[in-house]
């Protein structure tokens, strides 16, 4: 009888605990997030998800969903609650996304297609492209300040293939329309752009030169794992500027050396984005405030990219490690 009473009491306690846990799970604040289809975006989203779940009590359901117009439409329809790290220049290339409200070169968007169906929140990740030299080259040549000094040192960048000209390890794919040689010519930089065909080939050349401690000039963009592994300095190309006239035959905007492609690239102020109706709900007020405060940065992402892409570490483990080591950063994103 005593054992029977104990068994019944124990069973009741187990059932009670199960019901409490079930109720807690059922009542948990839930959101659905699209998992980015590139590593940088996945890192940014996992940082957000980890904080939403561990600090703000949300349960996040993750769905793999390719970036692009379909994702914007899924968020606008309420099928997905939020996604992370959209790049405006990528969106700009899509006909459906052509509008004047992009976060591009400092211009902040607050709505999708002008109808307010998607809200956007800047991430802190800023896409930047430039030509870069190793810091050891700058340290060895303290008079080198920016792109305008490249010709003074072109002999150090010359190769048997370029003769008296310096060499630029250029934008690797012609389809990206970087116009490296046109830019060099318009700016009077006596270098030859070398297009290697793939990002991997360009990076391999740069890594080999870095390990030999040779000077090299490299086209690259941030954030990128390369900057988490190697110390590089941008040459500060002239600030991005465009003009209205467009020369189709040359595929570049023809308005002299004051504008593209003689200037550098526009900055991409990337953003997280979500469904306004979802984040207008009282139970999601803290999540909405969190996204307005979240400010991840290029340097942190670059270091994490090295761990994931070069060391093949688990992405969630790398994010947890970053979160544990950087409470002074992410705690400022938590609503009061």
Q: Where do the protein language model's features map onto the residues?
A:
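Short, well-ordered beta-strand elements
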Residues: 28-40, 58-64, 165-169, 291
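An extracytoplasmic/periplasmic, membrane-proximal ligand-sensing/linker region
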Residues: 40, 175-191, 196-213, 224-225, ...
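Short, polar/charged alpha-helical segment
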Residues: 40-58, 184
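Pocket-flanking alpha-helical
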Residues: 45, 63-110, 205, 225-230
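Ligand-binding pocket segment of bilobal, Venus flytrap-like solute-binding proteins
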Residues: 72-87, 167-246
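A conserved helix-loop-strand patch within extracytoplasmic ligand-binding domains
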Residues: 106-168
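A bilobed periplasmic-binding-protein/Venus flytrap-type ligand-binding module shared by bacterial periplasmic
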Residues: 126-139, 268-283, 306-307
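C-terminal lobe and pocket-closing loops
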Residues: 228-290, 294
């Amino acid at each position: 009888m005593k054992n029977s009473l104990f068994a019944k009491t124990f069973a009741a306690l187990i059932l009670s605990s199960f019901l409490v846990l079930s109720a807690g799970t059922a009542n948990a604040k839930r959101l659905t997030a699209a998992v980015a289809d590139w590593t940088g975006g996945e890192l940014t989203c996992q940082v957000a998800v980890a904080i939403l779940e561990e600090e703000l009590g949300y349960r996040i359901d993750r769905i793999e969903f390719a970036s692009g117009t379909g994702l914007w439409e899924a968020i606008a329809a309420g099928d997905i609650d939020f996604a992370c790290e959209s790049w405006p220049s990528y969106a700009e290339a899509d006909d459906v996304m052509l509008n004047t409200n992009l976060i591009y070169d400092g211009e902040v968007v607050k709505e999708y297609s002008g109808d307010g169906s998607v809200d956007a929140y800047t991430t802190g990740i800023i896409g930047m492209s430039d030509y870069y030299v190793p810091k050891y080259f700058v340290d060895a040549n303290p008079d080198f300040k920016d792109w305008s000094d490249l010709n003074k040192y072109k002999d150090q960048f010359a190769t048997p293939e370029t003769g008296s000209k310096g060499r630029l390890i250029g934008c690797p794919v012609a389809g990206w329309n970087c116009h490296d040689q046109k830019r060099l010519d318009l700016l009077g930089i006596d270098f030859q752009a070398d297009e290697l065909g793939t990002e991997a080939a360009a990076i391999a050349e740069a890594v080999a030169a870095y390990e030999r401690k040779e000077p090299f000039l490299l086209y690259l963009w941030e954030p990128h794992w390369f900057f988490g592994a190697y110390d590089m300095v941008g040459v500060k190309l002239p600030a991005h500027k465009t003009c209205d006239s467009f020369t189709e035959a040359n595929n570049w905007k023809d308005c002299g050396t004051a504008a593209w492609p003689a200037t550098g690239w526009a900055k991409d102020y990337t953003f997280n984005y979500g469904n306004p109706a979802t984040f207008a709900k009282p139970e999601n007020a803290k999540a909405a405030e969190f996204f307005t405060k979240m400010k991840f940065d290029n340097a942190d992402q670059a270091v994490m990219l090295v761990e994931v892409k070069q060391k093949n570490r688990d992405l969630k483990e790398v994010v947890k490690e970053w979160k544990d080591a950087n409470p002074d950063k992410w705690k400022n994103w938590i609503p009061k």
